[in-house]
Regions:
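Iron-sulfur-associated redox domains of electron-transfer enzymes in respiratory
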Residues: 25-179
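Iron-sulfur cluster-binding cysteine motifs and their immediate structural context
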Residues: 1, 10-32
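Cys/His-enriched microdomains
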Residues: 7-17, 115, 171
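A generic, residue-level signal for flexible/boundary positions that often mark functional hotspots
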Residues: 3, 18, 133-136
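Short Fe-S-cluster ligation motifs
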Residues: 1-14, 42-50
Length: 179
């Protein structure tokens, strides 16, 4: 018997949505988030994926005119988050990193395997590593937008705020269990 972590499961979440008996569920860290929000020594930062912004209105049966990004930000601030960010910010950073890497690989084609694959989806990266390990070196070395956000929040943002990175608690609201 192996755990999912020991398998080559890409953590895409399809088994959770399709299990006929509901035996599987996503990992729930809601309690940890509430604890961080209640801790006066923690700076809580949340990032929201674009798909979540689009889906929340549908889930709650809200009129699209009412379900604005501004209202979502307000709601997250009301429950206690100190800072709210859009993951699109670091998606742009990922694109710049992958673009730079592509140009490096392109100008030194003989040193790299082709084609270069994106690394922006953790499920995709895990799938390639598990099912097609011979293509692992084709993957970009750039972090996913979600992972890049965590790194930026704990380094650059912490420095800008003048706080210890350990006091920053980052929450990711993502549409996918692989993230």
């Amino acid at each position: 018997f192996h755990t999912l972590g020991e398998s080559d499961c890409p953590f895409c979440g399809q088994c959770i949505t399709h299990c006929p008996v509901g035996a599987l569920q996503e990992h729930d860290d809601t309690g940890k988030v509430w604890d961080a929000l209640a801790d006066p020594n923690r700076i809580t930062v949340v990032q929201i994926a674009p798909a979540v912004r689009a889906a929340w209105a549908e889930y709650y049966h809200l009129d699209p005119k009412f379900a604005t990004a501004k209202r979502m930000v307000t709601a997250l601030k009301e429950i206690g988050f100190d800072y709210v960010f859009d993951t699109n910010f670091t998606a742009d950073l990922t694109i710049m990193e992958e673009g730079t890497e592509f140009l490096q690989r392109f100008t030194h084609r003989d040193q790299y395997k082709w084609p270069m694959f994106t690394s922006c989806c953790p499920g995709w990266v895990r799938f390639v590593k598990g099912q097609f390990p011979e293509y692992t070196t084709n993957l970009s070395t750039a972090k996913s937008p979600q992972a890049m956000f965590g790194a930026v929040a704990k380094s650059y943002f912490a420095e800008k705020l003048g706080v210890d990175p350990h006091n920053i608690y980052v929450v990711s609201i993502m549409p996918c269990t692989a993230k």
